[in-house]
Amino acid sequence: MISRYTREEMGRVWSEEGKFRRWLEVEIAATETLAERGVVPAAAAAKIRENARVDAGVVRRIAELESKVKHDVIAFTMAVGETIGDPGAARWLHYGMTSNDVVDTAQALQLREASRLIEHDIVRFGEVLERRAREFQHTPQIGRTHGVHAEPITFGLKIANWFAENRRNLERFGHAARQMAVGKISGAVGNASHLGPEVEAAICKRLGLEVAPVASQVIQRDRHAEYLSTLAILTATLEKIALEIRHLQRTEVREAEEPFGGEQRGSSAMPHKRNPVSSEQVCGLARVVRANAGAAYENIALWHERDISHSSVERIILPDSTILADYLLARMTEIVAGMRVFPERMRRNLDSTGGLIYSGQLLQDLVEAGAAREDAYKWVQEHAMAAWETETNFQQRVAADPRITKILDRVALEHTFDLERQLRHVDAIFARVFS
C-alpha cells in the first residue's frame, strides 16, 4: 500500500523487516522447542536465539540472495544463518520445516498484530459514535426513503444505527481474527512426518497461536477469505456513513458536513467550495477492500496439497486490506468527531413539506377512528398529491376536508401532526442500543 494511506504502526507490521522478524520468531520457537526435546543441541538453540537477527542490512542481504536463488525463504535462511556466526549452530535453523511452516505461521503473527490495531480502532470509533448519538438524541430530522421525505427521526437515532452496526463489526471481526490466529508446522503436505503433531502444537503454543487441526502444505484459505470478507463488511459500514454525510452536506440539504480546516481549500477554481472530500475518499478506498475480498475467494481453491497461485495475491491483499481498514477507521473517527451539525436546517427541511410527512399517521388515526382503510387512504393521498403539485400546506388542506373532520376533530388532528408523538420512543430505542 502506498504511504499516503499507511499509518505508522500498521506500516511496521507489514514492512519487509517486520515480516522477516516474524519469520525469525517462528524459526527460533521451533529450534527452542526441539532443543527441549533433545533433537537440537541446547547450545545451538541458544546460539541461534542470541545471534540470529533481522535488521535493515539483513533485509538487503535477503534481497540480494533471492535475486540469485529465486526463493525467498531459502534466501532468508541463508542470510540469517550468516548472522549466527557458527555454522554448527546455523545448520539447525529451519530443521524439519517446510517454507510455509514459517510463512503461514509468521503471517498469523502479523495478522494478530494487525487485528489488535484494527480492534482498537473499532472500539475508539464506537466511543465517538456513542458520544455523538447521545449529543443529538433528541434533535429532530426528517427520515428519508428513496431519497424522499418519509417520517421524522432524530439525528441521534441515525447515529445510533451506525453505532449498532459498528458493534456488530467488532463482534464479527473478533471471530475472524481468532480464526486467523493459527499456525502449522506439519510439513510439505500436512502429514507432520518430520516433527510430529506434539512438536507442532508445542511450537504454536510457544508463539501464542492455536494449531491448525489439519492442514496441507498451507493453512486452508477459507480462513483468509472470511477474514477479508469481514474487513469488506467493516469498511462498507464506513462507506455507508461517509455516503450519508456526503448526502447531508449537499447544498440543498446542508444538515451536516464533515470538518473543514481553517486553511483548507475546496477547489482551485471556485473559492466558495466546501467539498466532502474526506468522506469521498472513504467511499473510494472501501471499494478496494471489497475487491480484495473477492480475490481472497479465488485463493481457496488450490491444486492438491498446494500450489503457489495464492501467494502473490496475498502479498497484496493482506497488507493492503488491513492497512486500509486501519486508515479508514481512523479517518471516519476524525470525520464523525469533528462533524458539524445544523439542527435549525434539519428542522427547516422537516417542516418544508407542510405536514406531508404525517400522512402515514393520519391514515392510521382515521382507521382507528372508524374510517374504512381504502377510503382513508384515498382521501389522504388525494390531499398529499395535490399538496405536492400545488406546493400548498397539507395540514391545512386536511383540516378543511369535511370527510376527515367529521371523523377527527381539531384536537385529534393536532395530535396527528404532533412531532413529539412521532419521536416518543427514541429514549426506549436508545436504552436498547446502549444497554
List each model region and its residues.
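A helix-coil-helix interface module used to build multimeric assemblies
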Residues: 1-192, 196-202, 211, 266-267, ...
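Amphipathic alpha-helices that form helix-helix packing interfaces
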Residues: 30-33, 118, 122-125, 129-132, ...
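A structural signal for small-residue-enriched, beta-sheet-centric alpha/beta enzyme cores
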Residues: 99, 191-192, 204-206, 211-218, ...
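Conserved hydrophobic residue
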Residues: 40, 253-254, 372
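Short, well-ordered beta-strand elements within core beta-sheets of diverse protein domains
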Residues: 157, 225-233, 361-369
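Glycine-rich cofactor/substrate-binding loops
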Residues: 1-22, 46, 65-69, 270-435
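Acidic, glycine-rich loop-and-beta core segments that form the ion-binding/anion-interacting portion
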Residues: 200-293
